[in-house]
């Protein structure tokens, strides 16, 4: 989801109306209105928030979740689902979401109505990320008739694709998306440039911290290849970093592996 292009709809009023549907205390509603109008500080300059909740506001994440709940989740559950022919599911994280359908006709119908729904509340879909794909247990069979392959999609940094388990059963597998992987590798390269003058103990401590965080998020089943590739990239970057700190080469690859 991306922001709307115009100020046709006052989203602050919709936010208040959504909250009023669950909270009747006028004192709380008054505080919500004051928070929405409080404004934010940007580079030591005050910016008023006449529209939305304001980027950087302490209440912005909560307000955004409430807004998305009523605009999308509640609408999908209470209005859309009863009108569909088959099964449908919705997974939402912040302003990213994936919707699954049993029938293509339901997906096409929902996609058209979703655009109108978002526009009515001052939002719009990110066209580059929004698409209909053939995916699931029977996707390969259906795609083979047209000579195509099942689609893939990226969600929360993972590329999801159709595959099979060791027993030959259908299974959705996930791997680190190429975009996220390349971005993280670039960040490592830039970090190495800043750490050239650091002590080896400090460098390894920092890299271990990064690797631990990376493993905790991306360390899932079927993602071993990308995890191993990222670890190798970090090691290679460290190897080059240590050998560039002086005119004389500090380590060869074997010595480097023994050292770490």
Residue ranges of model-derived segments:
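Single conserved hydrophobic/aromatic residue that forms the stacking wall/gate
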Residues: 1-9
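A common structural junction motif
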Residues: 23-24, 115-123
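Active-site palm subdomain of RNA-directed nucleic acid polymerases
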Residues: 28, 61-101, 105-117
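Reverse-transcriptase-like RNA-dependent polymerase core
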Residues: 29-45
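A conserved non-catalytic segment of reverse transcriptases
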Residues: 37, 125-197
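Short, solvent-exposed helix-loop connector elements
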Residues: 47-55, 171-173, 189-203, 214-226, ...
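A terminal-accessory region detector
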Residues: 224-260
């Amino acid at each position: 989801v991306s922001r709307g292009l115009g100020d046709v709809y006052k989203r602050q009023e919709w936010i208040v109306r959504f909250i009023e549907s669950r909270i009747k205390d006028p004192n709380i509603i008054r505080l919500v209105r004051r928070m929405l109008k409080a404004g934010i500080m940007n580079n030591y300059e005050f910016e008023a928030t006449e529209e939305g909740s304001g980027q950087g506001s302490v209440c912005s994440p909560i307000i955004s979740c409430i807004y998305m709940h009523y605009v999308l989740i509640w609408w999908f559950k209470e209005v859309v689902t009863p009108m569909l022919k088959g099964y449908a599911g919705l997974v939402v994280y912040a302003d990213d979401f994936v919707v699954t359908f049993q029938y293509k006709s339901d997906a096409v119908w929902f996609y058209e109505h979703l655009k109108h729904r978002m526009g009515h509340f001052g939002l719009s879909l990110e066209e580059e990320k929004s698409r209909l794909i053939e995916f699931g247990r029977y996707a390969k069979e259906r795609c083979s008739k047209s000579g195509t392959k099942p689609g893939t999609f990226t969600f929360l940094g993972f590329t999801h694709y159709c595959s099979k388990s060791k027993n030959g059963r259908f299974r959705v597998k996930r791997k680190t998306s190429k975009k996220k992987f390349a971005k993280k590798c670039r960040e490592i390269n830039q970090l190495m440039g800043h750490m050239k003058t650091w002590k080896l103990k400090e460098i390894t401590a920092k890299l271990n911290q990064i690797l631990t965080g990376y493993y905790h998020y991306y360390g899932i089943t079927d993602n071993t290849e990308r995890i191993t590739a990222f670890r190798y990239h970090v090691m290679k970057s460290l190897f080059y970093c240590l050998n560039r700190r002086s005119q004389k080469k500090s380590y060869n690859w074997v010595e480097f592996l023994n050292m770490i």
